[in-house]
Every structure is written in structure tokens, then in C-alpha cells.
Amino acid sequence: MSGDPENPGQPERAAVAAFADDFLVGLREWLAIPSIGADPAHHGDVAASAHWLADALRRDGWPDVRVWDEGPALPAVYACWPAADPEAPTVLVYGHHDVQPVDPVEQWHHPPFEATVIGEELVGRGASDDKGQVAMHLLGVRAHLAATGAAQPSVTVKLFVEGEEESGSPYLTRLLDEHRDDLACDLVVFTDTPLYGRDAPTVCTGQRGVYGAEVVFTGGRSDVHSGRAGGSVPNPATAIARLVAALHDEDGRVQLRDFYADVTEPTAAERADYAALPFDEAEWLANAGGAQGLAGEPGWSTLERVWVRPTAEVNGIEGGYTGPGLKTIVPARASVKLSFRLVPDQRPERVADALREFVARHTPAGLHAEVIARGDGVPPYAVDVSHPAVEAVRDAVQAAFDQPVRFSRTGGSGPAALLHGWLGVPVVYLGATLPDDRIHAPDERVVVPLLLRGAEAAARLWRLLPERLS
């Protein structure tokens, strides 16, 4: 292919444009499958989604396509397209095809599984998270082959699309163990990541981890009349309030012992990139649930607080009587649910130990304390920004978007650290969605031209990697 006449030397762009209409038709078909992994009533749809993807891969010419549907995990899809050069690097593209529930469905302006086109946007559950981005990478492979005129890609491309990410990937470790040989690679490309903004393209280099737990204080066997025992027995609700108050100091720093001991701070170059990104406080607050003002750890910008600083958040408090009117009691039980966002090189198990120690220090005599972990937690991950694969992704995105690209991170969590740990290779990020795509919410959408630019970047990346990783 000779390339786009308006963009000489960019054959990937011309190839993406040639496939764009077909891409949109296929993506809409896939989005019509309600693959809600968290709902057992839709597990058949998750299987249908996996088989739809497998069929699409075969139509595209992938020579090795499999649906992994044995065992307890919901169906995952694996595919491999070997490079012509057996010495070329092997790259594993990771994504997921399960989607979030659609509740509250009455707040959708369009049916969540009809994939409605509105101007440049495609509205539907999974459009952004993550079917749209997986489809983007499939288009990238097609465009790469068309642009190079080759029958095989410049790198061996493997695809691993799981069906349980939105449920916390409970069987991902098992899949990685059982299929270790199939998934062996030199690099992982993580699809489930956004740009910073439509006019501020970025390359993500890491995401925070998370650990969650519930702390329960118990006093007597039952609630007791406050006139009978108030002031003479410890109050679990008061103790929970004091525990919560002690969780942070006046500057918002978390007071668990050695909480910051393992924190690795971003480089000066990364912080400079974050500072160079456009930031509108009013717009940011509006997208943060309509918050009324900023707060947080001194010495760090809002973006840094969200991306590269650890946090402790109170998710909910329960105890005593909260119904209409007044009930004069000393409650027998009170609890608080906490979540901790973690950054490299914090570990969920160390935070769990620190939380238990903190609770023990703040448990009054006469109360029983229990710390209930909500899962094992998810470790954080960050890739070295000087790694040649990261530089290749940045160059590919910069060429596709025709403007400077900066590094970013994301405040959420995902299985990047797990993939890195099991496969023993770096994880880089290449996505083209937006933070305001309303993922997990009504009217989830994706901006189609951004997906096309992302596909162009992916197509170019496959061409760059053999030289960069040599």
C-alpha cells in the first residue's frame, strides 16, 4: 500500500481508514452481546462473546485461535499470529470482553446493548471498557499487515482476552499458570487504559494497586438503652469514629505505621510531564462527582495525588440506629469499610499487616476488634519510562495523533502487576479512550476517531518493536 496521499509515509493511517467502516460494523455486533460477567444469568452471553471474538479473529486470518472454556473461569480467548522472522519479539496483547452491569438502566438514554452511533461517538456498554480497545488492537494488526504488504506481522502477536476482569479476575492466576507456555512473551501490551484527553494524548506507564478491608468493633451481645448503660460501657460507634479520625493527620497523610516506607516516587521527568498536562480545576471537580473543592497531601498536584500517591479512603460507616426519629441506645456493633490505593512498591499484604496493627492500637478496652479483608488486594505496577518499548509506544502514539505525547498514570487498579509477575516481562499500555467515557455508568461511550488513531498507533508499534527490542 502506498499510503495516504495527504499523509505520505503513513501507510498505517491509510490502512486503518480503509478498514474503518468494517471495524465499526463488527464492533457494534460485539457490543450487542450482553457479556455481564458478574451476573450468572449472563454467563451464557459471556461465552457467546468469547466465541464471537474467536470467529472474528479467524475471519481476520489469525492462524491459531482458541476459546479457553474449561474449568471454573468464564471463557477467555487466546490467539497467536507468528512473525515471519522466528527471532522477532513476541508481544502479548491483554484485554477483557466481559462488561459491567447496566444498572440503573433507566438512566440510559439509549439501549445499553444496541451500540448507538451519535456523531463521532458509539454509545453502549463495553464500548470503552474494554471491547472497543480490544477491537482497536485487532484493527491494528490488520492495518499493520496491509501497510507492510506482508502475510505475517513484524512481531509475533499473541492475544489474551479474559472474561472476568470486571469481577476481579478471580481465576486469572490459574489461567496464567495453566497456559504459561502459550502466554510466554517478551512484552505485554495492556489495552484497558485511557488517554488523558482528546487534545492531550498520553501514554500510561502505571496504575495504582488496591487493598480493601472492613473493621468491626463489637461491645455487648445486643444494643442497650443509653439511660441504662450510656457513659459506663464503651460505645463501638464512638470507637469507630475515633479510629476514622486517627487514620489521617492534619495534612491528609495516612497514619498506618510505615505506610510510606515502600513508596517509590515518580522521576522528575515524569512529574514534569504531569505538570505540562492541561488541568481545569472546575471541570475536573465536575467529573469527580461534582466535588466542591480540592484536598489532599501537600506538595503534590491533584493529578499526582490521584496517580502516584497512596491513599486511605473511608467507603462507608455503619452502626447503631439510623432510621427515622431517635433511638437512644449504645449500639452493640459498628463498622467501617476502608480501601487503600497503593503505589509502587507497596504491597497489599504489608498494608494489611499495618492496618491490623493500627486497629489494635485504637481498640478501646472492653471492645472486640475484627479486621475482615475483602480479597487479597491488587498490587500496583509501573514500568520504567526509559524502557525501549515504552519509548516505542510513545513514538507510535505521537505519530498517530500528530502532536506531542506525555506520560501519565491511572489511579485505578488492574492486573498489570499480576501479568508482570507471572510472565516476567514488562507491561506497557496502549489505549485510546477518555476518562469521561462514562465507563461503569449509564451511557458509556467511546469516541470512534480516537479508536482509529489508537489502531494506527498499534499498527505502527508492531513495525517499531523489532528494532527497538533488538
Give the ranges of each region predicted by the language model.
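N-terminal helical capping/dimerization or prosegment-like subdomains
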Residues: 2-105, 333, 337, 350
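Structural signal for hydrophobic packing residues in well-ordered secondary-structure cores
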Residues: 20, 31, 57, 61, ...
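An extended, acidic, His-containing surface patch that forms the Zn2+-binding/catalytic region
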Residues: 86, 197, 255-333, 344-357, ...
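Active-site metal-coordination/substrate-binding segment of hydrolases
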Residues: 88-158, 453
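Acidic-glycine-rich active-site phosphate/pyrophosphate-binding loop
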Residues: 105-117, 208-219, 395
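Fold-level recognition of mixed alpha/beta catalytic cores in primary-metabolism enzymes, strongest
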Residues: 127-294, 303-310, 421, 443-451
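A generic structural motif
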Residues: 128, 221, 340-348
